[in-house]
Amino acid sequence: EENEGGIAHLRQGRRDDGVLTLGEAMAQLDASAGNTLTPPDSEYNEQLEKLRAVLRSYKEHNEDVYGYISIPAVGLEYVVVQGEDNDYYLNHNYKKESLVIGSIFVDYRCDDSIAKNFNTVLYGHNIETNGGAMFNRVTDFLKKDVFDNALICIYTMDGVYIYQAFSVYSTRPDSGY
């Protein structure tokens, strides 16, 4: 049942969508490749290639996979998708399965390359369960210490984009922003 497959597991304080965090997936790649020493100057390129391998595996399940978002300071890590509209992923996971909590997704009007966008807009439900889930954790940016220190990392096939918040605004869904 949809509700039991989504919200019930979130209430138990764990993700049950079968998605490894990016760190877990990269650790699996490390383990399967064995421990090999690489020169320090190649470390960035090696990590980027591991990242791309993980993203390719997500894209094998769904061509709509855009990337991955990580905000370590608030414990947010999710696959990011981009659909043909801004409605589909409101209630579907990255595997295109029906899920009441939906996915974090990029506005359909954005380019598939962050570098080509003037603004890249991400959406996700503000669902609060057992300490927060989905984009509810972004509300922690209202706390000064989080706002001042948290980095927002978005990983795509193009590369790694690291942001620091410069403004936080709380609004209601019907505010007409």
Identify what each model region corresponds to:
Residues 1-177:
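Solvent-exposed, non-transmembrane regions of membrane-associated and secreted proteins
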